[in-house]
Swiss-Prot record:
Principal subcellular localisation of the protein: cytoplasm
Pfam families noted in UniProt: Guanylate_kin
UniProt keyword Methyltransferase present: no
Organism expressing this protein natively: Chlorobaculum tepidum (strain ATCC 49652 / DSM 12025 / NBRC 103806 / TLS)
Matches recorded under HAMAP family: Guanylate_kinase
Enzyme class: transferase
SMART domains: GuKc
Classification via CDD domains: GMPK (cd00071)
UniProt subcellular location: Cytoplasm
Family: Belongs to the guanylate kinase family.
Residue ranges that the Swiss-Prot or TrEMBL entry lists as coiled coil: none
Protein name: Guanylate kinase
Amino acid sequence: MSAEQVLDQGRLIVFSAPSGTGKSTVAKLVMERLGSLEFSVSATTRQMRAGERDGVDYHFLSREEFEKKIAENGFIEHEFFFGNFYGTLLDKTIDAIKAGHNLLFDLDVKGALNLKRIFGDQALLVFLKPPSMEELARRLQARDSESAEALKSRLERAEMELSHAGEFDFVVVNDDLGRTVDAVATRIAEFLPQP
């Protein structure tokens, strides 16, 4: 079955943004507002953070399990960064789309662009920009969960990700949460098939 045949039954919405931009919050609020989206849960080898649940926030896999799935072509996309693997499980995605679900993904820039390359116009790429690099640095420091070196790496990665914003279908600066959610929800509602 081709990607086009599967996707005639559901749509893909992909959120990307530098870490600390608020994409998880925006995604959650947009999902609550629209009610017609199902969150695609990514797999990862990173350690579970406080409050996270396996199968809800991520599918937490051992490195060995993840590498086995890579060898079996079990991912739509996967990435290795900051010492951990992240990926989108092919079987879970296909099952949800076949069931007619519209899936929302939280992916890095490379993963988003890979997904768009595979699924074309059936995928809508949404990029959230921070108000400024200074504000992004402040938000990341407020998390107090990373070393100075990791923070520096995240900020460098953010600059790279921001350079790809023009490759996305819809770009919005997250400087006001309410306005951002309104704009993103409106664009997604226009993209989804009408009943």
